[in-house]
């Protein structure tokens, strides 16, 4: 039974087949399952682990037991080096090949794996789990074999070198009185299922933290409560009638869409008396990595701080784990469903492979949650983008390859919920005109999927989606032949007393970018209601204005489009793309140089969508220029570092692709709606100096690249500082 086909790991075998196999044959099987090119050091580590374990596991060679290499914990994005399923016990092995000493961070890593299995892995809930750290050159071994004080059947982490691992396993089996041979059936394809314990902790964590602090807190509670109540009613009707339904929630930036999504995720999971409902759970999913990272870290830090103040012995990693019940990155949800399909796809139809998934009575082959909330659903990928991505196995070729994927991401997400055999509801949170990256499909792709593939789904949508930002204003037209559509104004987060600034700012931004004649009037309206918008041509003045505006712990930051190129002369650097960087940029205070408040690193639309600061500087580069009543779009063509050609110098060139032009326009739409309290727009003067020979000193920053845009803003009466 060596290496039965699965997408959950790189290698799986019974002990006997593994021990009798040639080590290089096992390594070859791991290579075959690995997507991408393994590093030499990774190869060497795998080979040493294989050779060690063939000897170490020999006492149990003839038992019914399994070994698994590189196991992916469903939907958590974590991978365990080696799992042993022996006598009903789960051993989590974390190897540090060539390492002599045990590090605290490594101990915490292997313990986290054990906790993740206990809390989220259905077939591990009621099992003994033993985390073992193995720095291979370590010369001593743990001598205490006890379950943790939390009475959860998890052993305290054990530490041993390679030479002591066999004895450690023997001692664990003796202490656990594990005398009967046996593995755990279907453990490798266990469904993702959070325990009631982790869900209750997550609920407490969420309810004791004001999410408005980190999402969009111009939202009006009356307005959002009406929308939340409507969605919960749709969910309840779907449950009672055994139907599949989808709700589209729309609204201006700052109207509270993310807040609505998180509230629905929590409230749907509990009955009116506050008890957890295992069958009615919901999950909030977003493809926005920085948003998920910042939300998760903010909630976790707050919970950790409050727990410590109460004298509780709690780790920050525990709080993060609790948050992950309700808030997850959408790609892991998607990948978990992809792991269940027959591959390659035949005749353009997705099918579940019963060898790769467990069918449950209620959820069928779907995920455990009846309700999935997709934030920023307009950013779901087109068929072309996701098909290309899966064909090459991800960005770097290191993920599951599906060579002929037949549908868009929106269609696949609906298909995933459609696998449930009872009922399901999808909630799509839609930002109009906020598709900002190549291959982001917008609301029209969701509607197309419903019309063409899922006509049996009920569709609930606002009747106000006539603006150009929503499927070019064609929402009603696209749905006119769908017989299952219900229109309701309760699904659009619109004007309210507390969100007037967000609503007015959104109207001004729409007119500004569309050259509507009321833009100047709307600007005055925004400013007169306490939201300052000022203009400058100097980054120093912009920084000074931000520092003067911010009081107490109010946050400032510089924002820039990802296509921008000529910002270094202004002493601005772009924040490197990583979720950790986004967390530090948003959450650290004014004493930390990684904080946005230092006004040194600028975040792009990719990093700030769905989040905001109090006061922002939007640095407007030459990538989008005003020209006689229209926008022109430019991309920066850099020189080839290794093969320079004559006349091949860095320069701006026109962006002619209409799709890319739309993304560039939407990028600025996102950037100038990120500030809660006010913003300064900096349009540089450029460089008008010439060389002694009369040539421009910097031909990439000519004043003409900026002056017309500056003139347009001035014509609207925007106050200059």
Regions found by a protein language model. Name each.
Residues 257:
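Conserved lysine of the Walker
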Residues 213-245:
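N-terminal pre-P-loop "Q-motif" helix
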Residues 422-425, 598-721:
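C-terminal accessory regions
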């Amino acid at each position: 039974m060596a290496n039965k086909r699965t997408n959950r790991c790189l290698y799986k075998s019974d002990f006997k087949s593994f021990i009798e196999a040639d080590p290089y044959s096992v390594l070859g099987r791991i290579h075959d399952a690995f997507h991408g090119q393994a590093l030499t050091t990774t190869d060497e580590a795998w080979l040493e682990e294989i050779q060690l374990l063939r000897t170490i596991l020999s006492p149990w060679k003839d038992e019914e037991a399994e070994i698994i290499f590189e196991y992916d914990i469903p939907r958590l994005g974590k991978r365990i080096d080696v799992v042993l399923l022996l006598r009903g016990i789960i051993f989590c092995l974390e190897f540090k090949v060539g390492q002599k000493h045990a590090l605290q961070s490594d101990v915490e890593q292997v313990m986290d794996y054990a906790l993740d299995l206990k809390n989220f892995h259905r077939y591990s809930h009621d099992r003994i789990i033993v985390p073992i750290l193995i720095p291979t050159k370590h010369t001593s071994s743990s001598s205490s074999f006890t379950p943790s004080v939390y009475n959860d059947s998890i052993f305290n982490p054990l530490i041993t070198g390679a030479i002591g691992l066999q004895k450690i396993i023997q001692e664990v089996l003796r202490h656990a009185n594990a005398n009967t041979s046996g593995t755990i059936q279907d453990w490798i394809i266990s469904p993702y299922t959070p325990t009631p314990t982790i869900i209750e902790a997550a609920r407490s964590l969420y309810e004791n933290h004001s999410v408005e602090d980190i999402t969009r807190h111009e939202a009006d509670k009356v307005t959002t409560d009406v929308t939340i109540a409507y969605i919960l009613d749709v969910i309840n009707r779907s449950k009672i009638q055994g139907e599949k339904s989808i709700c589209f929630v729309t609204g201006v930036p700052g109207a509270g869409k993310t807040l609505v999504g998180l509230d629905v995720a929590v409230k749907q999971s509990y009955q009116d008396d506050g008890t957890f409902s295992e069958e009615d759970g919901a999950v909030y999913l977003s493809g926005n990595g920085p948003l998920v990272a910042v939300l998760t870290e903010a909630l976790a830090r707050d919970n950790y701080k409050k727990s410590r103040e109460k004298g509780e012995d709690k780790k920050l990693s525990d709080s993060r784990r609790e948050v992950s019940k309700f808030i997850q990155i959408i790609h892991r949800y998607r990948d978990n469903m992809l792991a269940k399909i027959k591959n390659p796809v035949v005749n353009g139809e997705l099918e579940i492979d019963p060898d790769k998934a467990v069918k449950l009575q209620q959820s069928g082959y779907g995920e455990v949650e009846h309700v999935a909330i997709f934030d920023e659903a307009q950013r779901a990928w087109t068929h072309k983008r996701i098909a290309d991505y899966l064909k090459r196995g991800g960005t770097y070729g290191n993920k599951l390859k599906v060579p002929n994927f037949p549908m868009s991401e929106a269609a696949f997400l609906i298909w995933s919920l459609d696998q449930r055999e009872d009922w399901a509801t999808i909630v799509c949170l839609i930002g109009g005109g906020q598709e900002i990256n190549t291959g982001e499909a917008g609301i029209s792709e969701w509607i197309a999927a419903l019309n063409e593939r899922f006509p049996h789904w009920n569709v609930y949508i606002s009747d106000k989606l006539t603006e150009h930002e929503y499927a070019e204003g064609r929402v009603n037209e696209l749905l006119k032949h769908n017989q299952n559509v219900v229109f309701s104004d309760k699904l659009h987060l619109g004007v309210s007393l507390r969100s007037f600034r967000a609503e007015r700012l959104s109207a001004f931004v729409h007119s500004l970018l569309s050259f509507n004649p009321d833009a100047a009037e709307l600007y005055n309206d925004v400013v007169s209601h306490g939201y300052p918008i000022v203009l400058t041509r100097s980054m120093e003045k912009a920084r000074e204005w931000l520092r003067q505006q911010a009081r107490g712990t109010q946050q400032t930051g510089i924002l820039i489009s990802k296509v921008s190129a000529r910002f270094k002369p202004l002493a601005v650097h772009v924040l490197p793309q990583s979720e950790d960087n986004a967390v530090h940029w948003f959450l650290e205070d004014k004493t930390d140089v990684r904080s946005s408040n230092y006004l040194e690193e600028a975040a792009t639309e990719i990093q700030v969508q769905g989040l905001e600061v109090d006061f922002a500087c939007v640095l407007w580069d030459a990538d989008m220029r005003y020209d006689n009543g229209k926008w022109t779009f430019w991309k920066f063509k850099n020189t080839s570092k290794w093969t320079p050609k004559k006349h091949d110098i860095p320069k701006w060139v026109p962006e002619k692709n209409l799709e890319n032009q739309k993304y560039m326009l939407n990028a600025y739409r996102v950037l100038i709606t990120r500030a809660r309290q006010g913003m300064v727009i900096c349009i540089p003067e450029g460089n008008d100096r010439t060389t002694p020979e009369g040539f421009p000193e910097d031909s990439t920053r000519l004043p003409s690249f900026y002056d017309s845009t500056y003139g347009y803003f001035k014509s609207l009466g925007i106050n200059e500082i």
